[in-house]
Amino acid sequence: MARIAGVDLPKKKRVEYGLTYIYGIGLFTSRKILNAVGISYDKRVYELSEDEAAAIRKEIQEHYMVEGDLRKSVAMDIKALMDLGSYRGLRHRKGLPVRGQKTKTNARTRKGRRKTVGAATK
């Protein structure tokens, strides 16, 4: 099993899809990496030689921000928005949709489970 950027890639998958298991690498980026290193998309992860795996590791390390560093960077960007007091930062702080979606009826993913307001008795 190839271990790249701290992630165990699934053995039986093709390398182009296996690399997408790394946070920050999608299919397009995966193909760019394989082109730069000169490895065929059709190759399976278990077929990779140690030299090829090392070449992929080196390419990712030198040119891409992935896994922990990327997560930290995204978290710091969101924290900066909140500290600035920008509209986007306030939406993050309140746990509401950030990109202008309507919230009257939807936005359940961001808002969480419904909180029913009980009827007040006299």
From Swiss-Prot:
<dbReference type="InterPro" id="IPR010979">
    <property type="entry name" value="Ribosomal_uS13-like_H2TH"/>
</dbReference>
<keyword id="KW-0694">RNA-binding</keyword>
<dbReference type="GO" id="GO:0005829">
    <property type="term" value="C:cytosol"/>
</dbReference>
<comment type="function">
    <text>Located at the top of the head of the 30S subunit, it contacts several helices of the 16S rRNA. In the 70S ribosome it contacts the 23S rRNA (bridge B1a) and protein L5 of the 50S subunit (bridge B1b), connecting the 2 subunits; these bridges are implicated in subunit movement. Contacts the tRNAs in the A and P-sites.</text>
</comment>
<feature type="compositionally biased region" description="Basic residues">
    <location>
        <begin position="98"/>
        <end position="116"/>
    </location>
</feature>
<dbReference type="InterPro" id="IPR018269">
    <property type="entry name" value="Ribosomal_uS13_CS"/>
</dbReference>
<keyword id="KW-0689">Ribosomal protein</keyword>
<comment type="subunit">
    <text>Part of the 30S ribosomal subunit. Forms a loose heterodimer with protein S19. Forms two bridges to the 50S subunit in the 70S ribosome.</text>
</comment>
<dbReference type="GO" id="GO:0006412">
    <property type="term" value="P:translation"/>
</dbReference>
<dbReference type="InterPro" id="IPR019980">
    <property type="entry name" value="Ribosomal_uS13_bac-type"/>
</dbReference>
<keyword id="KW-0687">Ribonucleoprotein</keyword>
<dbReference type="GO" id="GO:0003735">
    <property type="term" value="F:structural constituent of ribosome"/>
</dbReference>
<keyword id="KW-0820">tRNA-binding</keyword>
<dbReference type="Pfam" id="PF00416">
    <property type="entry name" value="Ribosomal_S13"/>
</dbReference>
<dbReference type="GO" id="GO:0000049">
    <property type="term" value="F:tRNA binding"/>
</dbReference>
<feature type="region of interest" description="Disordered">
    <location>
        <begin position="98"/>
        <end position="122"/>
    </location>
</feature>
<protein>
    <recommendedName>
        <fullName>Small ribosomal subunit protein uS13</fullName>
    </recommendedName>
</protein>
<keyword id="KW-0699">rRNA-binding</keyword>
<dbReference type="InterPro" id="IPR001892">
    <property type="entry name" value="Ribosomal_uS13"/>
</dbReference>
<dbReference type="InterPro" id="IPR027437">
    <property type="entry name" value="Rbsml_uS13_C"/>
</dbReference>
<dbReference type="GO" id="GO:0015935">
    <property type="term" value="C:small ribosomal subunit"/>
</dbReference>
<dbReference type="GO" id="GO:0019843">
    <property type="term" value="F:rRNA binding"/>
</dbReference>
<comment type="similarity">
    <text>Belongs to the universal ribosomal protein uS13 family.</text>
</comment>
